[in-house]
């Protein structure tokens, strides 16, 4: 039978461990975002082709699925995390150059960055302070993700601007939901590996940014 003192001690230890994971996650996340930004600016300046960007994305996906599962619990996991986020950031070069060349393009990019930051900070702060359990969203989010991927693949051949806007809007909602879900997992002690947590949150932010950029880009073209 657990004594009150033992229960309080265990609760304190869990809280300290959770706070440590949160602190390490957000510190590493900030470093990976800086790495991605530098890589993106470099590939924008170089002017890499979409084919090169695709190769970089495929290499990053390979690291995510085949390297990270083995390295995530070791110090090499940190190295691979920066390689992964560097490749993902660098792959944004052609897309960012495309939007930058549009009328008011730099403003659109800045707006997308600002909105992404506001959404992420707002949702994270709400989840951390409320400690609400968002695990109930899991099935809805993964179903939404599958729908977004399938719809995006179909629209490659259809080429509908309206469909693109709808897909980007749903995608923004889905990845906002994933921010709530993943933050909740850390707060509730379900995610204890800060490298894994960082990668999940990084992908949420990246996809939220690209979704918002698409939405703002389409709206800017219609003005």
UniProtKB/Swiss-Prot annotation:
Please tell me whether the keyword Cell membrane is annotated for this protein. yes
For this protein, the parts annotated as crossing the membrane are 25-45, 46-66, 78-98, 105-125, 140-160, 161-181, 199-219
Q: Which GO terms describe its molecular function?
A: calcium channel activity
For this chain's UniProt record, which GO biological process terms are given?
A: regulation of proteolysis
Keyword match Cell membrane: yes
According to its UniProt record, where is this protein located?
Answer: Cell membrane
Alphabetical UniProt keywords: Cell membrane, Membrane, Transmembrane, Transmembrane helix
Protein origin, superkingdom: Bacteria
UniProt cross-references to InterPro entries, sorted A to Z: Bax_inhibitor_1-related
A GO cellular component term found in this entry reads: plasma membrane
Q: How is it placed in the membrane, per its record?
A: Multi-pass membrane protein
| Similarity comment | Belongs to the BI1 family.
| Protein name per UniProt | Uncharacterized membrane protein VC_1358
């Amino acid at each position: 039978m657990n004594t009150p003192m033992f229960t309080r001690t265990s609760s304190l230890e869990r809280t300290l461990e959770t706070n440590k994971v949160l602190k390490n996650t957000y510190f590493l996340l900030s470093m990976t975002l800086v790495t991605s930004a530098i890589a993106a600016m470099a590939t924008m300046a170089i002017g890499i082709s979409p084919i090169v960007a695709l190769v970089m994305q495929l290499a990053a996906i390979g690291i995510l699925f085949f390297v990270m599962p083995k390295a995530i619990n070791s110090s090499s996991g940190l190295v691979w995390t920066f390689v992964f986020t560097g490749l993902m950031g660098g792959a944004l070069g052609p897309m960012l150059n495309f939007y930058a060349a549009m009328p008011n393009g730099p403003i659109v990019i800045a707006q997308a960055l600002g909105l992404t930051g506001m959404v992420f900070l707002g949702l994270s702060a709400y989840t951390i302070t409320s400690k609400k359990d968002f695990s109930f969203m899991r099935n809805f989010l993964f179903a939404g993700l599958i729908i977004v991927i399938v719809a995006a693949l179909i629209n490659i051949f259809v080429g509908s601007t309206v469909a693109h806007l709808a897909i980007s809007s749903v995608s923004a909602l889905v990845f906002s939901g994933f921010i709530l879900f993943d933050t909740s997992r850390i707060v509730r002690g379900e995610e204890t590996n800060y490298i894994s947590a960082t990668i999940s949150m990084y992908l949420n932010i990246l996809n939220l940014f690209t979704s918002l950029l698409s939405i703002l880009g389409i709206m800017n073209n219609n003005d």
